[in-house]
Amino acid sequence: MFRPTGGCSLAILGVFIFHIGEVQSQCWESSRCADLSSEDGILECIKACKMDLSAESPVFPGNGHLQPLSESIRKYVMTHFRWNKFGRRNNTGNDGSSGGYKREDISNYPVLNLFPSSDNQNAQGDNMEEEPMDRQENKRAYSMEHFRWGKPVGRKRRPIKVYPNGVEEESAESFPMELRRELSLELDYPEIDLDEDIEDNEVERALTKKNGNYRMHHFRWGSPPKDKRYGGFMTPERSQTPLMTLFKNAIIKNTHKKGL
C-alpha cells in the first residue's frame, strides 16, 4: 500500500491524464513514467507530460524525425527572424506574459498550478530575444548611411556676390588694359552738367527714401540720353543750322526762281 501522499499524487495524475486524453499516450511510453511506485517518480512523470503539452503544435504519432521540435530548439531557431517570437499572433498582451490561446487553455488546468510555472524562463527568453533586434536596428542605420536619403552629402551652392557699385571685380580683371581703355572710349555717356547732376541726385535720394526703390544710375540703361531712346526713330532729326540761315536760303532760292 502507498502512503497517503502517494495516493494523493496518483489521484492528481489520474485527473491530469483524464484532461489530456489521447495526446498523452506517448507520455506513458517515456522512461520517466516507468517508475510510479514513489512520489518522486509520479512528479517526474507529471513534469514530463507538462513539457510535452507546452509545445504549440500537436504531437503526431510515428517516427521521431517527424515529431515537432522541442521548446528550446524552437526558441533558438526563431530568434534569427525579425518577428523574434513564436506564435505572436495569438498574444493578447503587450508585455509578453500572456501566450497564445493553446497555452492559456493548458494553464487553466488546476493540476498544473501546483507546479512552478515557466514565467521566469519566458522572461529570460524575452531579454535574450531583444538583443538581436537592437543589433538589426544598428545594422540598418549603418547601411542607410550609404544612401542619399540616409545622410545627405553634397556640394554647397556658392552664394551670389552682390557688389555695391554694381560691377563685378572679376569682369574688370578679365580684360587687359588696352581693351578696357577702348571700351571706355566707345561708351556713350549722357552729357549732364555738374549742377544739374547734383540737384538730380538730391531729388532722387529723397524719392528713394520715401518710396524705398533703388534706381541704378551707374548703368547705361539707368538713364539713357533722350536722342537715343527707342532706337532714335521716334525723335525728329535736328539740323545744325539756325533758323535765320534757313529763311535766308529760302528767300534766295525764291528770287532765283523768279528771275529765271
Curated annotation (Swiss-Prot):
User: One GO cellular component from the entry?
Assistant: extracellular space
Q: Any idea which GO molecular function terms this record carries?
A: G protein-coupled receptor binding; hormone activity
**What SMART domains is this protein classified in?**
ACTH_domain, NPP, Op_neuropeptide
Q: Where is the signal peptide?
A: 1-25
Positions where Phenylalanine amide occurs in the chain: F86
Q: Which GO terms describe its biological process?
A: neuropeptide signaling pathway; regulation of corticosterone secretion
Keywords for this protein: Amidation, Cleavage on pair of basic residues, Endorphin, Glycoprotein, Hormone, Pyrrolidone carboxylic acid, Secreted, Signal
Entry-linked InterPro entries: Mcrtin_ACTH_cent (IPR013531), Melanocortin_N (IPR013593), Opioid_neuropept (IPR013532), PMOC (IPR001941), POMC-derived_peptides (IPR050878)
User: Which Pfam family would be a valid example here?
Assistant: NPP
Indicate where this protein is primarily found: secreted
Q: Give the span(s) annotated as Disordered.
A: 116-136
Q: Where in the cell is it found?
A: Secreted
**Could you tell me what this protein is called?**
Pro-opiomelanocortin B
Name the lineage: Eukaryota, Metazoa, Chordata, Craniata, Vertebrata
- The protein's gene is named pomc-b
